[in-house]
Swiss-Prot record:
Pathway: Isoprenoid biosynthesis; isopentenyl diphosphate biosynthesis via DXP pathway; isopentenyl diphosphate from 1-deoxy-D-xylulose 5-phosphate: step 5/6. This is 4-hydroxy-3-methylbut-2-en-1-yl diphosphate synthase (flavodoxin). It comes from Protochlamydia amoebophila (strain UWE25). Belongs to the IspG family. The lineage of its organism: Bacteria, Pseudomonadati, Chlamydiota, Chlamydiia, Parachlamydiales. It catalyses: (2E)-4-hydroxy-3-methylbut-2-enyl diphosphate + oxidized [flavodoxin] + H2O + 2 H(+) = 2-C-methyl-D-erythritol 2,4-cyclic diphosphate + reduced [flavodoxin]. The gene is ispG.
Amino acid sequence: MVQKKYCEAIHQTERRPTRIVNVGNVGIGGNHPIRIQSMTTSSTRDVEATIEQVIRLADQGCEIVRVTVQGIKEADACEHIKKGLIKRGYQIPLVADIHFYPPAAMRVVDFVDKVRINPGNFVDKRASFKQIVYDDESYAREIERIEEKFTPLVEKCKRLNRAMRIGTNHGSLSDRIMNRYGDTPFGMVESALEFARICRKNDYHNFLFSMKASNPQVMIQAYRLLTQAMYALEWDYPLHLGVTEAGEGEDGRIKSAMGIGSLLIDGIGDTIRVSLTEDPWHEINPCQRLIKLASAYQQQGVAPFIENYRQIEAIERRQVHLSSTVPMHRDGTVFISLPINMLKEASLYQQIGCEGPFGKPKLKTATADNLVLKNPNSDSEEKRQLQILKDLGIGLFSKDPFEMSLVIHPLKKWLQSRAVDSFASRFSSSWAKSAGQPLIIQITDETEKEWKEVISLKPQLIILSPSTNRLHYSRQFFEWLQQNQLNYPVILNFTYQGENEDTILLASMECGSLLCDGLGEGVWLEGPYDILFLRQLSFSILQAARLRMSKTDFISCPSCGRTLFNLQDVTKRIQSRTSHLPGVKIAIMGCIVNGPGEMADADFGYVGSKPGKIDLYVGKECVEKDIDFADADDRLVNLIRAHGRWIEPQTVNA
């Protein structure tokens, strides 16, 4: 089935055309550059503190700033914040973030440039996650109720020339939407379209959409489904991109880059925010880097091709055959290049992810699965160390024949030998020397015509190593594999050269886009970086793509004026006690608004309920309420233990 259109082109990056939405003096969409946004963490009632944060963000390069508006007092504070900014020479647009309370939106729209509403809770109550049956008639009545409550805001925004963002979050869909569409990207899209139809009915068009989730795969799918719907409807509204509750540090940047960057390479997105559990100005540099990296993709790509197999409506991992003769992990395999001289280094085990004294290593959950040896030789000490690693279960590979490793054969060399009309020249190559070994082929920049050799060679593994246009070339190759019903596993072998920060983002964008589409059985990242960096990045990418969970996954909101405790300090404290629990997902939320709903992907939740009090969740269910802040960390650990997910730190194999 041919893929329904969701972007301008699948073979190259071409920005999706949109109308222009004006937010104060800043235009979004059209031919405007991709805009950078952030959000203050101060109490909105603290006018001076909020002004200072907005100014600091603007000075860092932020173009639009959002503040939380829970009620009328916060709405009134926005008048003074806006005036204070103008008095100090800052015309940066101000956005009010609204949840649950339409009167606050009606008040604050007098003072700000844009209002963000959440269609999941603007009119509907907080989801109870209960089964509720809606027939068509009762469902229609609910839509009428939404229209009655929402239309006054639409009319006022239109009259005052204010902008609006209809911002759906995966975790805060209404009971009504979930009972008809499920807790799915399809529900996210329909939730937003309901509100957009009301805007259009009132001839109001100065709005844009967002589809945020803490899971990058869900987020990517939701945005693609939305653009697919807009192409079908012939709508052209801009999009604000973001992964909500991405967390902090490298993991937060990886999740954000995977979600935001994947869409930017598709040409989707007009404004972005990297939501980090850090001071808000730390979000600006990753945004700037993402935009720069995505811009380099503009008009880059491969020859046009038609996709029949990659479907955005139902994402499934490609079905492959894993040979018992090639070491592979079913949830995603990590290859690492290893210079042969590293075998004598004391830091070897730390670099590849083992533990234990030198000569007696032990595997951990993030130990490299396979090592690709550079310039292997017959040094006895090095061979002894290799045998130790091999006995441990780590696969050894090389690009040249070596007695202890499996050989990776470049398809280019095979084609060159085929071009020479000599039986001897073909079989004097490394292909013959690997007789009896599984066949592992490396594809670089060969053409589709040259790929056909793969059919007759029947490899057990393919290393995919395009040097340019990595994403589009890889998509085209996977489509060709599917068309020819070839179920060979494929490792994404991408080489990078930039700064560490850029490589973290670009590798997450490129590998993440493919992995989130179910394409690729692992990663092999290369470049002028230390092995530890590449290994940790590889495992983090697999985890962010929800393939292989090698460490605790933290879902933490970026904090805002609603937050009831110091989110950064609490997050670090909880991480220090629970970071040894691979596969466990823990959400740390500053308030009830960003609590049970927004942490839809978590196993356990730690949520501020009122000043000095914490609620604990298992999934979406609140199991302990109003715990004293001082006791909450211990109670969280006890809760994890009670559900059989706790491992003592000294015994964990992580």
